[in-house]
A protein has these predicted regions:
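Early transmembrane hairpin module of multi-pass membrane proteins
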Residues: 4-98
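Membrane-interface transmembrane-helix boundary segments in multi-pass integral membrane proteins
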Residues: 11-30, 185-186, 196-239
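Alpha-helical transmembrane segments in multipass membrane proteins, preferentially the mid-helix core
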Residues: 35-39, 99-103, 156-175
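Membrane-interface capping segments at transmembrane-helix boundaries
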Residues: 39-47, 243-258
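Membrane-interface helix-boundary motifs at transmembrane edges
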Residues: 43-56, 105-114, 167-178
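Aromatic-anchored segments of alpha-helical transmembrane domains
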Residues: 63-72, 122-133, 184-193
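Alpha-helical transmembrane segments and their immediate interhelical/interface regions
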Residues: 68-86, 138-169
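Membrane-proximal helix-loop-helix units in multi-pass membrane proteins
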Residues: 102-160
Length: 264
């Protein structure tokens, strides 16, 4: 058990990023995540909204409970009570630690925007935090506390995104766009301030660190101004495109349903 938890350091060498072990583990995890989200989403689709949100409430307790345990344990393992400074929920994927509870327990526009936010970024964050987690899988063995807990929290984010879509909880109304933008902007600003003060690399606003963000970092020449602004801008574009495509699909469905049926 000491080896799994990394107490005293890991004796095993990391299998490596994009190794068979890495890909097998995250693919199995994502397959179970997607299957369970679709099954539960279909089961709850016709249930009252209150019942649908109970599933999100359970997911919120699970993801926050796991993360809280991880923070406390890592402070103990690293013999550093300030280790939590490097474990704040200020990455794209860990933002879900806050937005999933907002979606589960919130009311009104903030609830709607939080549901939209989890749908839009939950699965993306899950994929980036598993398949794209080059930093983690290059540093720790696949079946280790660091990677297993990270995999589980990312899987819960992905589960919530798929479940929200399948169960019909999301609205993706155009009026929610400014609130969704505001949620993202608040987290990005907080992450950048933390990056400067700690210092650290929350939201990968300082550098790519072996993730797909390295592409943007290279294209901007690592500019301390244009790189974070480009990353932030791409997030906003992604949100806008997601809403745009969804509303186009909705409009087409409405048009088709309202069109007269010839030969009836």
């Amino acid at each position: 058990m000491k080896e799994f938890f990394g107490i005293g350091g890991y004796a095993r060498a990391p299998e490596g990023y994009m190794s068979f072990g890495h890909l097998f583990f995250v693919t199995a995890l994502m397959a179970v995540t997607a299957a369970s989200a679709v099954i539960l989403g279909r089961r709850y689709r016709s249930r009252p909204r209150r019942d649908k949100k109970r599933v999100l409430a359970v997911a919120a307790f699970l993801i926050d409970g796991l993360e809280l345990f991880k923070i406390v344990f890592l402070c103990f393992r690293e013999h550093n009570p300030m280790q939590w400074l490097y474990l704040l929920p200020l990455f794209l994927c860990s933002i879900q630690l806050i937005t999933i509870p907002m979606a589960a327990f919130g009311k009104g526009r903030f609830e709607e925007a939080a549901l939209d936010f989890v749908l839009i970024f939950g699965l993306l964050g899950a994929l980036l935090g598993t398949y794209g987690a080059g930093q983690n899988y290059a540093a720790y063995p696949v079946l280790s506390f660091d990677n297993v807990v990270s995999g589980l929290t990312h899987a819960i984010s992905g589960f919530c995104a798929i479940y929200i879509g399948v169960s019909g909880l999301c609205s993706l109304k155009k009026k929610n766009v400014p609130v969704t933008f505001a949620i993202l902007s608040g987290f990005c600003l907080s992450a950048y301030i933390a990056d400067v003060l700690i210092p650290y690399n929350y939201m990968f606003l300082i550098r790519g660190d072996g993730t797909p963000y390295d592409i943007v970092y290279g294209l901007t020449g690592g500019s301390p101004v244009f790189y974070p602004l480009t990353v932030y801008g791409l997030f906003l574009v992604y949100i806008a495109v997601f809403y745009l495509i969804t509303n186009i699909i909705k409009r087409r469905k409405t048009t088709q349903q309202g069109a007269p049926r010839h030969g009836a």
